[in-house]
Amino acid sequence: TGPYVLDHWDKGQQAIFKINDKYYGDKPYFTQLTLLFPEEATWLELAKSGDVDVVPVATSALNQSVDGYQFVEKSAGRAQGVSFPYQNDTGDSWNGTWKIGNNVTADKAIRQALNVGVNRQTMCDEIFSGHATPEYTSVDTRDYANPDAKVKDGDVDQAKAILKEGGWEDTDGDGIVEKDGVKASFDLYYPPDYLDRQSLATVFAEQAK
């Protein structure tokens, strides 16, 4: 149990918590907590209204300030990244919509080339205005992380060498490498309600070119 219990919930709108009288520890300072669930695009305007005490900062507003609010930077405790299917196109789909497998990303050379070719620090600077640190394994900050798993990224020449060694070459001069008649082109999906993931997908795609 915790110091608060759910008192009222409006699905998709808010959740109100009150003090848990049966909590074994000290009573909290605040007698009530109200958590709102606004769209990310409205976070900044919500702060400007002065109607909330704490509000997340969208990536598009990281360099902006709001009177009466102090910017506090905390570790998110999670990593953001791009993941690829490891298996070839199975011909099946999930929920009748999403294809299972991809003939391009299933090739190890493609994944390795993208891993060393993209520049993570540039992504942190462009998307998060420097309020982020590069992540290489998704568990870099954990006690069980393996520092040897990190790679030197931003090395386009090495990425090209990996692709060539793996049999991927641009034989028709269109700027896209291919192998066995398959072009190294694929769709990259992101949830539209998360602006940071949209930005990550966009910047990643530009670097991958």
Show the residue positions of the predicted features:
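Extracytoplasmic/periplasmic ligand-capture domains
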Residues: 3-127, 143-175, 180-209
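Short secondary-structure junction motifs
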Residues: 30, 134-136
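Short, solvent-exposed turn/loop segments enriched in Gly/Ser/Thr/Pro and often Arg
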Residues: 127-133
